């Protein structure tokens, strides 16, 4: 996954999953179970994979069919609206539908390995949280506490931390979404 470039995964009833990704991600993706990987040179602002994605979809579905996208609430296309419009224009014989519900249902299915990874990170986070009070000192800021917490997660086996809010205050906290402050 890239924070700036789209990555596409095509899931078909009749084919193994196919990844359509920027070429910079190919080496990493080859280490996974995905066997079919199509790439484009990126960055390429005039075509961030839409032509490769279009051709791949046409090869899978031929000239008609439904294309499900995660376009429901709490979802992201991970491509510009202009690129989405271009894709729909390129594939005008196809019907684009909201597949959010089925994608969420698929995400609920976990392998034994995924379950073990989830248990591991829950254990790591719980242990760090349970011991946090031993390391907090008077006059530490939320930023310092949050940074300590992140370091402890990493040093105890977490792969990375994407986002962490932090809040404090007399009698509790009044929000759970903001970044830590100098408070």
Predicted regions mapped to residue ranges:
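Contiguous, non-catalytic segments that form substrate-binding/exosite surfaces or channel walls
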Residues: 137
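Functionally constrained cores in energy, signaling, and assembly domains
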Residues: 19, 103, 115-120, 133, ...
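Active-site pocket-lining segments that scaffold enzyme catalytic pockets across diverse folds
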Residues: 122-132, 142-144, 150
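A composition/biophysics-driven feature that prefers long, compositionally simple stretches
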Residues: 1-124
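Short catalytic-site patches enriched in acidic/histidine residues
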Residues: 1-3, 100-102, 109, 140-183
